[in-house]
Amino acid sequence: MRQYLDLLAHVLENGIDREDRTGTGTRGVFGYQMRFDLSDGFPVLTTKKLHLRSIIYELLWFLKGDTNIRYLQENGVTIWDEWADENGDLGPVYGAQWRSWPAPDGRHIDQIANLLNGLRENPYSRRHIVTAWNPAEIDGMALPPCHCLFQFHVAEGRLSCQLYQRSADIFLGVPFNIASYALLTMMIAQVTGLKPGDFVHTLGDAHLYKNHFDQAREQLTRTPKPLPTMWINPEVDDLFAFGYEDFRLEGYVADPTIRAPIAV
């Protein structure tokens, strides 16, 4: 994906060096946008291989409203281990906000169910928004949401999604986020009778950690390959009924993984 390599190059060449919460140090820019036409193929990196299993199971975990890593660990996914407490809990992170946002009157709001209803009943609304940024519960979260708000848009029978990501770990996090929200868009398009449109990824603080510079430069020496396609089981018409076996990435050819340390 040339869009992603352009982002890497832009930050390396034009970013500003700053200290950060983790003490690692970053180079970054504030404000950057990428657009992916989902009819061109599934936007997963081909210049390094990604662990698609982790991406799919994490998305299913979000949609379940789960905030304990037990489900992830049972399915071989360890990407949240560093932030969980001794019981595997993360506090009211993404899944809780998506599926059970606490209202002042004691109700809990299922933002995903509301989104689906809105897309079916009033597709041209400008209110198809889900947010994970709940100021009242930030302090109880193991990690405040990085990808914090997304909006859907319907035009000419195509469903597009724009994600706002306040904090974007370009080397490790952003490739996962692109694939995850592209897949979510395709899933929601299927269950609402629409075709996938664009995924627009808007980044706030887009940064490379200093201990990822060499890995980013190595990736920039690689040439992108044709995008694969994502097969989604056409029999599934309920967003909450999808399982891991309902997805298959076809034609995925990628360069080897480039390992990099995670900043906690």
Swiss-Prot record:
EC number: 2.1.1.45
Pfam family, one: Thymidylat_synt
Localization, UniProt: Cytoplasm
Binding positions (dUMP): 21, 126-127, 166-169, 177, 207-209
GO cellular-component term (any): cytosol
Chain residues that bind (6R)-5,10-methylene-5,6,7,8-tetrahydrofolate: 51, 169, 263
Active site per database record: 146 (nucleophile)
NCBIfam families, A to Z: PRK01827.1-3, PRK01827.1-5, thym_sym
Subunit structure: Homodimer.
HAMAP family per the UniProt record, alphabetical: Thymidy_synth_bact (MF_00008)
Function: Catalyzes the reductive methylation of 2'-deoxyuridine-5'-monophosphate (dUMP) to 2'-deoxythymidine-5'-monophosphate (dTMP) while utilizing 5,10-methylenetetrahydrofolate (mTHF) as the methyl donor and reductant in the reaction, yielding dihydrofolate (DHF) as a by-product. This enzymatic reaction provides an intracellular de novo source of dTMP, an essential precursor for DNA biosynthesis.
Protein name, UniProt field: Thymidylate synthase
Organism this protein belongs to: Chelativorans sp. (strain BNC1)
